[in-house]
Amino acid sequence: MLSYFKELSLRRPAWLLLATLACTLEVTGLYFQHKLGLIPCVMCIYERVALTGLLIAGLIALIAPNFFLFRWLALVLWGFSAFKGLSLSIKHYDYQANPSPWNQCEFKPQFPQTIPLDEWFPNIFAAGTVNCSEKQWQMLGWGMPEWLIVAFSLFMLFFLIVFMSQFKRAKPQYRSVFR
């Protein structure tokens, strides 16, 4: 099984799938914001940044998945983004499951001064005035944080499988004179 995932990681379609899934979730969030009128909270914006990291990881590996540097850079970014997105989604769920005055998120995203994404791309990364504990949307009884926990858990699971597969040695190519 690991050799199968190693072979997948050496080809572009698998990385295109990662980028497409992340882009689909990103576009879905933007659709909820701009078309359905749901105002994103700060945690939603942070989760959106994690999805952007997954998208960038897929695009980096699309350049040349056979080259060690591109593949490992994409793997590191994939793992970090999936882990960070999962931890942010769990924290966001905690805000909604246990609302209290002392368990709240910030009012404005705290991006580094060198990369103020909320100022550079306000239509994508600017948060509204919504409290993180407010549930604005549900599907099948689950809110946005629960669905993102599922999504980031799957991203993390497949990252771990692909990461472990990188240490699998390739099968030697036996060449026959008569073949």
Curated annotation (Swiss-Prot):
Matches recorded under InterPro entries: DiS_bond_form_DsbB/BdbC, Disulphide_bond_form_DsbB, DsbB, DsbB-like_sf
Domain of life: Bacteria
Topological domains annotated Cytoplasmic: 1-14, 66-72, 166-179
Keywords recorded for this protein, A-Z: Cell inner membrane, Cell membrane, Chaperone, Disulfide bond, Electron transport, Membrane, Oxidoreductase, Redox-active center, Transmembrane, Transmembrane helix, Transport
GO annotation, biological process: protein folding
S-S bridge residues: 41-44, 105-132
Cell compartments where the protein resides: Cell inner membrane
Function: Required for disulfide bond formation in some periplasmic proteins. Acts by oxidizing the DsbA protein.
Protein name, as recorded: Disulfide bond formation protein B
Organism for this UniProt entry: Haemophilus ducreyi (strain 35000HP / ATCC 700724)
Source lineage: Bacteria, Pseudomonadati, Pseudomonadota, Gammaproteobacteria, Pasteurellales
Gene encoding the protein: dsbB
